[in-house]
UniProtKB/Swiss-Prot annotation:
Single Gene Ontology BP annotation: telomere maintenance via recombination
Species in which this protein is naturally found: Saccharomyces cerevisiae (strain ATCC 204508 / S288c) (Baker's yeast)
GO CC, one annotated term: mitochondrial matrix
Domain of life: Eukaryota
Subcellular location: Nucleus
Function: Involved in the repair of double-strand breaks in DNA during vegetative growth via recombination and single-strand annealing. Anneals complementary single-stranded DNA.
Pfam families for this protein: Rad52_Rad22
PANTHER family the UniProt entry points to: DNA REPAIR AND RECOMBINATION PROTEIN RAD52, RAD59, DNA REPAIR PROTEIN RAD59
Protein name stated in the entry: DNA repair protein RAD59
Quaternary context: Interacts with RAD51 and RAD52.
Length: 238
């Protein structure tokens, strides 16, 4: 038997019950809204749209120039251009980047032979590959995370490590800024399908109700404490 959900139906969290381990009080935890991959306000929707228009104007000639071929946009647009667009769009204090993790994954030494006119010399070089994970957060809480790679070949191992990590962070930052387009497209699709049950954006009223309008059940020494949110829909406790 196949059961299909009605297109107009939506998820409700009215009867959701939250629990904690013995010895913990649910009221000691803060209610936090995580806006990863979702716009937190109309401001971010408008600003991300403006950012995309700047990127499209910059890359129009790139995609219409056959010498570049079909490459990923993050490889064609320079990082300094994206940072400039972000500063112009969100404001210098309207966004920030946090490096979640950066690490050199492999280091491969090899011997490079230099063929001169009269002499043949060899030199040991190193190729280092690094990976980085960064998080870009707008001032209203909208955020996204992306990973990047860096690959550098030099004769100095220490310089290889430093530059490969820097390149990995720069690559991750570019991908994160470019990923805002996908966030908006996905957001518009979910609005069309009535995906959100907690409103289009966060609400201070909802968060205040979540802090006060809960019903604590009695707890024993061997059972965890439970809390039921009756009026606050779509609120997450972390």
């Amino acid at each position: 038997m196949t059961i299909q959900a009605k297109p107009s139906s939506s998820i409700s969290y009215d009867s959701t019950t939250y629990g904690t381990a013995p010895g913990l009080d649910i009221k000691e935890f803060q209610i936090i809204e995580d806006w990863n991959g979702r716009p937190a306000s109309a401001w971010s929707v408008q600003r991300i749209g403006l950012l995309q228009s700047k990127i499209e104007r910059y890359t129009y000639n790139i995609y219409h120039n056959n010498k570049y071929g079909k490459h990923n946009l993050s490889k064609l647009i320079p990082g300094h251009a994206l940072i400039q667009f972000a500063n112009e769009t969100f404001g210098y204090d309207g966004w920030r980047m946090d490096v979640i993790d950066v690490e050199a994954r492999e280091c491969q030494p090899f011997t490079a032979v230099n063929n001169g006119e009269n002499t043949n010399t060899s030199e040991v070089k190193y190729t280092v590959v690094a990976e980085a994970q960064v998080k870009v957060t707008l001032k209203d809480g909208t955020n996204t995370q992306c990973g990047g790679l860096g690959r550098i070949t030099l004769s100095s191992r220490g310089e290889c490590y430093n530059r490969s990590k820097k390149e990995a962070v720069g690559d991750a930052l570019k991908k994160a800024l470019l990923s805002f387009e996908k966030i908006i497209l996905d957001y518009e699709t979910k609005i069309t399908n009535n995906y959100y049950v907690d409103g289009l954006y966060g609400s201070k009223k909802i968060k205040n109700e979540a802090n006060t309008n809960y019903n604590l059940l009695s707890a024993t020494n061997s059972k965890p404490t439970f809390i039921k949110l009756e009026d606050a829909k779509g609120t997450h406790i972390k």
